Amino acid sequence: MATADELDRREREILRALVQDYIHTGEPVASQPLLSRHELEWSPATVRSVMADLEALGFLEKPHASSGRIPTERGYRLYVDTMLKVRPPSPADRDRIERLAQAAPDVSSLIEGTADLLHSLSHHAGVVTTPRPQADPVRQLEFVRLRENRVLVVFVSAAGIVTNKLVQLEFTMEPAELERAAAYLNEKLHARAEAAEPELAALRAAILGDMRADQSALHDLLQKALVLAEQSFAAAGVEKVVMEGESSFLDAPEFSDVQKARALLRGFAEKDRILRVLDRVLTAQEVQIFIGAESEFATVPDVSVVAAPYGRGDRVLGTLAVVGPTRMNYARVIPLVDLTARQISRALAALSEGG
């Protein structure tokens, strides 16, 4: 197989023009329309010959009996890596991104708003992962008694994410006991704020240490606090995916086939698969583009992911992405994802300082 460096100027120019046309029209591109839309200096016969060569090299393919050709995943990859000229987001797009980052009252609203905004700006699916538990530990707990042995646990993470979990206990805790347990556990959490070990391991060690110290007046409360902590943290610490606009794929001609569309939507429903894809971006310093099979997003072809990490300071918390057809407008989507990740990171820092 030829590499990008082995293509001559004529082959590169024709491939670039064809990919751009296919992204714009969604229709297989023939030589004559290509010549009419671009100022190519070669004859129709030459263009047809070069297109045939590019097909033989694996950069183009000819669907069915069509007279035109479309890019393969290899063709898209070459285009994105070596030919693409990204353009900065428009002032209107930039303003919408900045307004979201400045106006979000809390981290949860920021995450949800980001997924919706990415969908709105790109017209593809917007996807955002909530901060990872490893990077965003629990910093405060609150217990609310609902019934004798049912407790609502309110978690507040270091980034300000608030989540609720219902815990069923095998014993009864009075509201005053729950308040004392929360105060005790929060004191231990704050003391371990910079520790590398998970919250539950730190809490368990601290509680057992206090119990061994024979603080008899607190012994019963500490036993209950230990059980409460174990059950609470067993229900917490799950990275989540927020998505908006999955159905936008159904507007693309590539997904007009019902079986293919169903397979794609099943892929969106498999949150673990999505997390595996997006977690590959956590160690990156910039936008990452996964084209087609590279993404492992779903069991169907023609899906690409443009993703970037976001964080607070030098700590990466999660990932945001646009998921769309391989025929997406990369020149527009890549800078949108990049700017959004940077603005959301700044907003997280501001929310953290404000909290």
UniProtKB/Swiss-Prot annotation:
GO terms for molecular function: DNA binding. Keywords: Repressor, Stress response, Transcription, Transcription regulation. InterPro entries: GAF-like_dom_sf, HrcA, HrcA_C, WH-like_DNA-bd_sf, WH_DNA-bd_sf, WHTH_HrcA_DNA-bd, WHTH_transcript_rep_HrcA_IDD. Pfam families: HrcA, HrcA_DNA-bdg. One of its GO terms (biological process) is negative regulation of DNA-templated transcription. The keyword Iron-sulfur does not apply. Belongs to the HrcA family. PANTHER family: HEAT-INDUCIBLE TRANSCRIPTION REPRESSOR HRCA (PTHR34824:SF1). Negative regulator of class I heat shock genes (grpE-dnaK-dnaJ and groELS operons). Prevents heat-shock induction of these operons. This is Heat-inducible transcription repressor HrcA. It comes from Anaeromyxobacter dehalogenans (strain 2CP-C). The gene is hrcA.
